[in-house]
Design a protein with these regions (language model features):
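Alpha-helical bilayer-embedded segments of polytopic membrane proteins, i.e.
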Residues: 4-25
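Short acidic-hydrophobic, aromatic-tinged amphipathic segments that line or gate anion-handling sites
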Residues: 64, 121-124, 214
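Catalytic core of membrane glycerolipid acyltransferases/transacylases, capturing the structured
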Residues: 25-44, 48, 55-57, 72-128
Length: 254
């Protein structure tokens, strides 16, 4: 497709995505007064609509691999974070996820109110030691309720293939929660790049990797989790570029 076609599709998707997001946040605000699982159903509906719009307008599909590696019940999910896409599209893959997010998000009208309603784990980043202790305590509560705790251990979106910068918070959770830890690799940043307007056609792959059992020494757990994430992420990026060697994303992120 010519560059103008990618721009037009990206523009149409952005208009549709933000329109449906705004309409659902306001239109479903009554769910703030309903049971939490009703609100979670609304969140998953939004995610499914958004991924459908991306497929229909841009041509970006979603493929999930390794679902059998996700145990039932409480689990710690440690996922790569390359794109805004990750923050909504992963949600329907879990039964009742509690996502670790920055505390400032709760002040955003409607969106922040729903974050509180979902009992996501909101972390204040200005006081690291206090924030870490509070995060672990909140995560223990969510696990006790049978929920899945989802953390993006790099703390921010990272370009595909960029050197990783894992923060130690996920290891504190691994030690404290005593539940299986499932690494999740993906290649979303190739198709929905960070800090860029363009969206590209292709297949975003989400790969659930074999769980790391609880109770391992921290150094061993760190090596197993991070090496698995990096190896699978590199493989997914290489696979996408091999499948579409002339695609615009091939030179969009280095």
């Amino acid at each position: 497709l010519p560059p103008d076609a990618f721009m037009l599709r990206s523009l149409l998707f952005a208009a549709a995505f933000y329109a449906i997001t705004g309409l659902m946040l306001v239109g479903l605000s009554w769910l703030l007064l309903a049971p939490r699982y009703w609100a979670m159903a609304g969140l998953k509906l939004h995610a499914r609509i958004a991924t459908w719009l991306l497929h229909v307008i841009v041509g970006t599909k979603m493929e999930v691999r390794g679902r059998e590696n996700l145990p039932e019940g409480p689990v710690l999910v440690v996922a790569k974070h390359q794109s805004t896409w990750d923050t909504f599209a992963l949600i329907p893959l879990f039964d009742d996820p509690a996502i670790i997010l920055k505390d400032e998000l709760k002040w955003i009208p409607f969106y922040g109110w729903f974050c509180v309603k979902f009992e996501h784990i909101l972390v204040k980043r200005d006081k690291a030691a206090v924030a870490l202790k509070a995060m672990v305590a909140d995560a223990k509560d969510r696990v006790a309720d049978g929920r899945q705790v989802l953390i993006f251990p790099e703390g921010t979106r990272t370009a595909p293939g960029a050197p990783p910068d894992y923060k130690p918070g996920y290891l504190a959770l691994y030690d404290a929660l005593a539940v299986p830890c499932v690494p999740v690799a993906l290649n979303s940043g190739l198709f929905w790049p960070r800090r860029k307007f363009m969206r590209y056609p292709g297949t975003i792959v989400v790969s659930f990797l074999p769980p790391v059992p609880p109770g391992l020494p921290r150094k061993v757990a760190k090596e197993r989790i991070e090496s698995a994430l990096e190896a699978e992420s590199r493989s997914l990026i290489a696979e996408a570029r091999m499948d579409s060697p002339t695609a615009p994303f091939s030179n969009s992120e280095k």
